[in-house]
């Protein structure tokens, strides 16, 4: 335990909290342009072709963003909105593309969990 005199001379150091999504710079989402759209394979024990894209953000960062849902319409030069949220089995992927915003269309024929995939309410 430090004495009061020691604390007066050298106060306690504040703990620095490291962000999991530094490219967002404390914003909820950021806009960017796709520089490359491709598929990649997850780490063991999973197996798939995960759809991802490299995005150059408006603040100059270049990040890898996951494209959720079945099928997408993204290609190079598409303007997308990204949010935080990593993909556990893809190392280096710490962002998600927001479906149904800007150039990224919502998922076709999606009936459940629509809000996460940018789908409007179907006509009954």
Curated annotation (Swiss-Prot):
Originating species: Aliivibrio fischeri (strain ATCC 700601 / ES114)
NCBIfam families, alphabetized: rpsL_bact
SUPFAM superfamilies: Nucleic acid-binding proteins
Protein name per Swiss-Prot or TrEMBL: Small ribosomal subunit protein uS12
Annotated coiled-coil segments of the chain: none
3-methylthioaspartic acid: residues carrying this PTM: 89
Record's keyword terms, sorted: Methylation, Ribonucleoprotein, Ribosomal protein, RNA-binding, rRNA-binding, tRNA-binding
GO BP, sorted A to Z: translation
Oligomer and partners: Part of the 30S ribosomal subunit. Contacts proteins S8 and S17. May interact with IF1 in the 30S initiation complex.
Similarity field: Belongs to the universal ribosomal protein uS12 family.
InterPro entries reported for this sequence: NA-bd_OB-fold, Ribosomal_uS12, Ribosomal_uS12_bac
Functional note: With S4 and S5 plays an important role in translational accuracy. Interacts with and stabilizes bases of the 16S rRNA that are involved in tRNA selection in the A site and with the mRNA backbone. Located at the interface of the 30S and 50S subunits, it traverses the body of the 30S subunit contacting proteins on the other side and probably holding the rRNA structure together. The combined cluster of proteins S8, S12 and S17 appears to hold together the shoulder and platform of the 30S subunit.
GO cellular component: small ribosomal subunit
Record GO terms (molecular function): rRNA binding; structural constituent of ribosome; tRNA binding
